[in-house]
A protein has these predicted regions:
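Terminal amphipathic alpha-helical/low-complexity segments used for targeting or macromolecular assembly
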Residues: 1-58, 62-64, 77, 83, ...
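Glycine-rich active-site/cofactor-binding loop and its immediate structural neighborhood
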Residues: 70
Length: 326
């Protein structure tokens, strides 16, 4: 037995597409019987075709201000709540929950994923127990890197809020992402934390990775924006905070702590152990810092450390070393 019918009344909805204004005729869904938390006679959202909402399962479009059209499919026990606009071949199934969102251009949502008060556009997969919460822009785009077919994914138990995730980025495991910008093929996974704020985001770009129990934290002062570029990695229990820029072939691991003012690492730099680096510091070209080494630039001063060099043990550096002294 069908669980809903389409209203006789139609509603014309206009929307922009490819720089042009399009219009579509929609009809409202009306429940024919009680199921789940829906009662017979309840009016829901608006669709352009009965194929949009499956007659089987408990899936439903709850809000009378929601529009779903142009090749979209809602299946299983999926719930669409709040005012949503969903169009252009979006697929929502299983126990997915969408609340107050704009979804379009081939996005796939399944399993127990939650998406709230966000925009999702482009071919991507949001799945598992992942949560995409308030203020996110998920903008997928393929063909911008060598991995031309890789699609943007957020899955497992990852939580993302107030962030912009674009291109082919991957967020998974138990990662937590707040106020961040993640682009291209960057990855955030395991128990990693990206923790920006309403003033400064955390940036993870290109092929950079944050994983393990690593923490990357933005400050609240001007330019306190931690940025990982190219192939930079922050792993294990490392902590990177404030105005830090990590570039080519940089690995920060162990229990290392970096606090920028500004701090820049580039060209095959490895920081591990319990190393600590603070202040206006530039480290470049085959430098390894390990054990309990400390590098701190004095206030109003800068420090340059260029390799090849190894700094380890209990070494404590507070000024640029003389040539050959290390």
């Amino acid at each position: 037995m069908s669980k809903y019918r389409l209203s006789d009344e139609t509603r014309l909805f206009s929307y922009p597409l490819g720089g042009e204004k399009k219009s579509v005729a929609l009809r409202q869904i009306i429940a024919l019987r009680d199921f789940n938390d829906v009662t017979a006679g309840s009016a829901g959202g608006w669709v352009d075709d009965e194929q949009v909402l499956d007659q089987a399962g408990n899936c439903w479009i709850y809000d009378e201000n929601s529009m779903v059209f142009d090749g979209c499919r809602i299946r299983g026990n999926a719930r669409i709540t709040g005012s949503c606009v969903i169009c252009l071949n979006v697929e929502i199934s299983d126990n997915a929950w969408v609340d107050g969102c704009e979804l379009s251009h081939g996005a796939i949502l399944r399993d127990n994923v939650t998406v709230q008060s966000s925009t999702v556009r482009g071919v991507c997969q949001l799945r598992g127990e992942a949560r995409i919460l308030s203020g996110c822009d998920i903008i997928a785009a393929r063909g911008l890197t060598q991995e031309r077919e890789q699609v943007l994914q957020i899955y497992d138990r990852a939580t993302v809020s107030h962030s912009r995730v674009v291109h082919q980025a991957q967020i998974y495991g138990d990662a937590t992402v707040n106020y961040a910008f993640i682009e291209h093929r960057a990855e955030v996974f395991d128990f990693a934390l990206l923790d920006g704020n309403e003033i400064n985001d955390v940036w993870v770009c290109d092929c950079a990775k944050v994983y393990g129990h690593a923490r990357v934290i933005a400050g609240r002062q001007e330019d306190e924006i931690p940025t990982l570029r190219y192939s930079a990695q922050v792993a294990e229990n490392a902590r990177v905070e404030g105005n830090c820029v990590l570039k080519h072939h940089v690995l920060v691991g162990g229990h290392a702590q970096l606090r920028g003012g500004p701090l820049q690492l580039d060209e095959k730099v490895v920081i591990q152990g319990n190393a600590r680096i603070e202040g206006n510091v530039l480290i470049a070209h085959e430098v390894e810092i390990a054990d309990n080494a400390v590098i701190i630039a004095a206030e109003s001063d800068s420090l340059l450390l260029r390799g090849p060099k190894v700094v380890n043990g209990d070494q404590h550096i507070t000024r640029t070393p003389l040539v050959g002294s290390l």
